[in-house]
Amino acid sequence: SAASDVYKRQSVNGFIKIYDPENNQIFVNKRNAIHYENMSYALAESLSNSGQGWIHEINFGNGGTSIDPTGIITYLTPNNTGVNASLYNQTFTKIIDDRSISNTDPVRNKTEVRHVSGTNYTDLIVSCLLDYGEPSGQDAFDTTTDANSLYVFDELGLRSWNPAGTGNLLTHVVFHPVQKSLNRLIQIDYTVRVQSLSGLTGE
């Protein structure tokens, strides 16, 4: 129903910005799809102090688009249904939980909660930096013509943590292909806005 749709769109929203922090070139700046089933479960797990459910990593992939011989790009629909949803073709993962011992750079790969007193929404800011040397095996320069190269990313998503190491996909965004290569940094600023359902403001 329309009311149900409004509920889903307004309770949790996602926004993503992907750019080169050296020259501020913006590659992606858009909303993204929320996996409402998995997100609701993760929120409940976190609130209940169950020891799992928080955002742990960003998954990167190269299966979100297809390009025909004339250069026309087709964007696939984000995977935001089914508890076992995943990226179309995951090729890299970066841990952004700054409390995790597996996070190799918690200063630049972290989560932060931002709230302004008196408002009915709170932002969770996820920061992720792909440094010059990562991922291992990338091309030296961002000049590839192969859109299916492992590190030409066109999709990414936030994933939660659980003890089995098989956390759930919480968000999924598909975008114009962006190559990660040795000659460039890529910064991802990912905002998840959690908003109450009364007095919907702050859009």
Task: List each model region and its residues.
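Small cysteine-rich, disulfide-bonded extracellular modules of the LU/uPAR three-finger superfamily
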Residues: S4, K8-F153, W161-E203
